[in-house]
From Swiss-Prot:
It comes from Thermosipho africanus (strain TCF52B). One of its GO terms (biological process) is tRNA pseudouridine synthesis. It catalyses: uridine(38/39/40) in tRNA = pseudouridine(38/39/40) in tRNA. The active site is at residue 52. Formation of pseudouridine at positions 38, 39 and 40 in the anticodon stem and loop of transfer RNAs. This is tRNA pseudouridine synthase A.
C-alpha cells in the first residue's frame, strides 16, 4: 500500500482548529471527509501540526495510506482538490516511506505572524492583527534575540498538557514589509501550544514601550504563564512551512 504526503494551505477563519472534533468543522475533518468520498472508506491522516481555531496555514503537511496502488501524485492532488471546500487547497502530493509521520519527521517549522498598524481594513480583519499603535521594531528585535536558542518556554505555553516545556527557537525575524505591515517570522523544530502567539503578545508589549527588551529574560526565567503578556489573536498566525 502506498503512503502519500500532501502539502496544503487553508484559511482557518471558519474552522474550529485543525484537529478533528465531533459536531464542529475542522480542517482534519474536512480532509478525511474528502478522502472518504474518493476511496469510499475512512482514511485517517497524520499532520505536522495542529493549529488553533482561526489560525491559517500556507504549508501544512499531512500523510495517509492510499488503498489504490495505481494512483499517482498528480491523481491524489487533483482528486483531493475536486472534493475539498474552497478554503482548503492541496499544493502538492508525493510518495513517502510507510513509516513517515510528519509530526515526528519535521526538522523545522516556520510560523509567520502579521500585524498591521494601519487604519483597520475590514477585508483583512481575519488575516492580520490590526493594532492601531506604533511599535518600536528595534526594541522588539532585541527582545526576540533573547528567545533564540534552547529554553524552558513554560511562560509561553497554554495549559499543562506538555510534559517537557523545553524547546529550541532557531531564529526570530521581525520585518516591516510595507508601511504599517509587520511580519514576525519564528523558526523552530517544534512548539508548545499557543507558544508563538504568546511570544508575539510579549514582543508587542516591548514594542509599545511598556516593557524593556530585557524583560523577556525575566519572563523566561520565571517559567510561569502569568509572567508573560496576553496571547495574540489567532487570525494573524500562519503555519508557513514545514521542512523535513
Amino acid at each position: 500500500m502506498k503512503r502519500f504526503a500532501i502539502e496544503f494551505a487553508y484559511d482557518g477563519t471558519k474552522f474550529f482548529g485543525y484537529q478533528g472534533q465531533p459536531n464542529v468543522r475542522t480542517v482534519q475533518g474536512d480532509l478525511e471527509d474528502a478522502l472518504e468520498r474518493i476511496f469510499k472508506e475512512r482514511i485517517y491522516t497524520q499532520a505536522a501540526g495542529r493549529t488553533d481555531a482561526g489560525v491559517h496555514a500556507n504549508g501544512q503537511v499531512a500523510a495517509f495510506n492510499c488503498p489504490i496502488e495505481r494512483l499517482t501524485e498528480t491523481d491524489i492532488k487533483n482528486a483531493l482538490n475536486a472534493n475539498l471546500p474552497d478554503d482548503i487547497y492541496v499544493k502538492k502530493a508525493w510518495v513517502v516511506d510507510k513509516s513517515f509521520n510528519p509530526r515526528f519527521a519535521a526538522t523545522k517549522r516556520i510560523y509567520h505572524y502579521f500585524i498591521s498598524t494601519n487604519e483597520k481594513d475590514v477585508f483583512m480583519r481575519n488575516y492580520v492583527w490590526n493594532f492601531r499603535y506604533d511599535l518600536d521594531i528595534e526594541a522588539m528585535r532585541k527582545a526576540a534575540s533573547f528567545l533564540e536558542g534552547e529554553h524552558d518556554f513554560s511562560s509561553f505555553k497554554k495549559g499543562k498538557d506538555e510534559k517537557n516545556p523545553v524547546r529550541t527557537i532557531y531564529r526570530i525575524r521581525i520585518l516591516t514589509l510595507k508601511k504599517g505591515l509587520i511580519l514576525i517570522r519564528v523558526e523552530g523544530r517544534s512548539f508548545l501550544r499557543s507558544m508563538v502567539r504568546n511570544i508575539v503578545g510579549s514582543l508587542v508589549r516591548v514594542g509599545l514601550g511598556q516593557w524593556k527588551p530585557e524583560k523577556i529574560l525575566e519572563v523566561l526565567e520565571k517559567r510561569s504563564r502569568q509572567e508573560a503578556a496576553g496571547t495574540a489573536p489567532p487570525h494573524g498566525l500562519y503555519l508557513y512551512k514545514v521542512l523535513f
